[in-house]
Amino acid sequence: NMGYGDTPSRILNYLAQRSESPINVISLTGGVNYYLPNTESNVFNARLHLIPCPLILSSSFIMEELKKETAIQRISKMALISDFTVVGIGGVDTNATIIKNSILTPDDYLLLKKQGAVGDILSHFIDINGNLIDTDLEKRLMSPALTDIEKYNNVVGVAGGPHKIEAIYAVLTGKYLDVLITDENTATAVLDLYQSKNNIDTERKDGALQ
């Protein structure tokens, strides 16, 4: 299984390069047309099972109707028996794939930040505690529900960099992953943030007791 984003796209190239036989790749979201054309020619060593629609639909009605289509239901069922699920973790900044591809506007991002969003997983925006930011976008998003992520096997999150620290922290706090792949500096920064959050909570509890 693969989620939307640049990092899953690069992983697809990596796997296709090193696989002796074709691999089956199942998309979890719509919008794959935005990044699959950028993959290398060796991607054809993969059997692609794609959800053939945009990531964000024009209305919730269209999204719900598309989910009833046999082809999309078949892909959704395949995803439940896949061995691995690879997802990117997006930050809330103008370099995010979802905004570089003009799916969301800078104004959309400003609004999400005002609502407390620090990142996204499978294009669901979440706050620092891993809770869903419920917006109109949610009703038009072709992506598994956050509550369904636990149904997938071996969910691997791949992300790194200073602009992803809060997003990674939020995803880990929400317990959406089985495995996180990142670099040492990012891992250290996420641990520092965790310790900082715990220290703040401890001081508040001590103050309350006094």
Labelled PLM ranges:
Residues Q17-R18, G31-I200, A208-Q210:
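Conserved phosphate- and dinucleotide-binding cores of soluble alpha/beta proteins
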Residues N1-Q17:
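Helix-turn-helix/homeodomain-like alpha-helical modules used for DNA recognition
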Residues A16-V25:
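A short alpha->loop->secondary-structure connector
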Residues G3, I26, G30-N33:
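Flexible loop/hinge segments that line or gate small-molecule binding clefts
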Residues Y4-T7, I23, T182:
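N-terminal phosphate-binding or glycine-rich loops at protein starts, especially the Walker A/P-loop
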